[in-house]
């Protein structure tokens, strides 16, 4: 009996560091063994763009010589356009990254990398965001290998509905990783103060202060896993409803007067 070949995946890759980022190129090359890889990414660095979607201006795209597609927009724009009109075929999964720098704790609220994955899930596809820890960014190949493994696992055991995975990988050789940990989001202390300066024309300008240091970073958190050289895998829900607050809110809503 002739065996039927297992259909290859069609993967959509995006990021927030821009279409020319090293992490994106390494990820695309590594995942090519799994199937067809389409890359649709911002034309420049869009870190911190969160879930912003361009609604009041047209978006220009450019087909690059390497086959990637550059979008004059945010990470969310890229994934939205790719899935709803730019790509000739629907992808099977969205992968965002590899981000240059971790997305831990409160970072996920601002991260364009996480937002790109979230947009994929909004549009009905399994999705994950992957970030490389540290500051030197030497081992993108490690993060790419981790993603390769996770995609193979997700194929066999799909993610729960309305869930994406936020993956953070230590900047280490693969053989030095201590394992995989399923984690919750930690928290940071309040951000550093805004920095006020004067421009050459005498006008005040402001720089957003640095992210605050780790606060809730104990066992079970994404911070803890990364600090102990483990890959952090945090499931994030698209549904932001705080169901545990329903009873409390219902009790005082009854006392409101119209």
UniProtKB/Swiss-Prot annotation:
Its EC number is 3.1.3.5. Its main location: cytoplasm. InterPro entries: SurE (IPR030048), SurE-like_Pase/nucleotidase (IPR002828), SurE-like_sf (IPR036523). The keyword Nucleotide-binding applies. The keyword Flavoprotein does not apply. GO terms for cellular component: cytoplasm. A divalent metal cation binds at residues 16-17, 47, 99. SUPFAM superfamilies: SurE-like. It is found in: Cytoplasm. It comes from the Bacteria. Nucleotidase that shows phosphatase activity on nucleoside 5'-monophosphates. PANTHER family: 5'-NUCLEOTIDASE SURE, 5'_3'-NUCLEOTIDASE SURE. Belongs to the SurE nucleotidase family. This is 5'-nucleotidase SurE. It comes from Coxiella burnetii (strain RSA 493 / Nine Mile phase I). The gene is surE.
């Amino acid at each position: 009996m002739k065996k039927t070949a297992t259909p290859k995946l069609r993967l959509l890759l995006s990021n927030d560091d821009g279409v020319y980022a090293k992490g994106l190129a390494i990820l695309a090359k590594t995942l090519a063994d799994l199937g067809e890889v389409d890359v649709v990414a911002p034309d420049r660095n869009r870190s911190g763009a969160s879930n912003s979607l361009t609604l009041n201006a047209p978006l220009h795209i450019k087909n690059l010589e390497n086959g990637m597609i550059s979008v004059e927009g945010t990470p969310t724009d890229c994934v939205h356009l790719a899935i709803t009109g730019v790509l000739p075929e629907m992808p099977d999964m969205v992968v965002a990254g590899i981000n240059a720098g971790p997305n831990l704790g409160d970072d996920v609220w601002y991260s364009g990398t996480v937002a790109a994955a979230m947009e994929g899930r909004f549009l009905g596809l399994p999705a994950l965001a992957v970030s490389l820890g540290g500051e030197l960014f030497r081992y993108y190949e490690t993060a790419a290998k981790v993603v390769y493994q996770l995609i193979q696992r997700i194929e066999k055991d799909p993610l729960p509905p309305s869930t994406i995975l936020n993956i953070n990988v230590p900047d280490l050789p693969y053989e030095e990783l201590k394992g995989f940990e399923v984690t919750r989001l930690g928290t940071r202390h309040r951000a550093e103060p805004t920095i006020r300066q004067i421009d050459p024309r005498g006008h005040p300008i402001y720089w957003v202060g640095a992210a605050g240091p780790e606060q809730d970073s104990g066992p079970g958190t994404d911070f803890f896993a990364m600090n102990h050289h483990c890959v952090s895998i945090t499931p994030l829900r698209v549904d932001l409803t705080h169901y545990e607050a329903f009873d409390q809110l219902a009790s005082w809503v009854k006392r409101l007067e119209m």
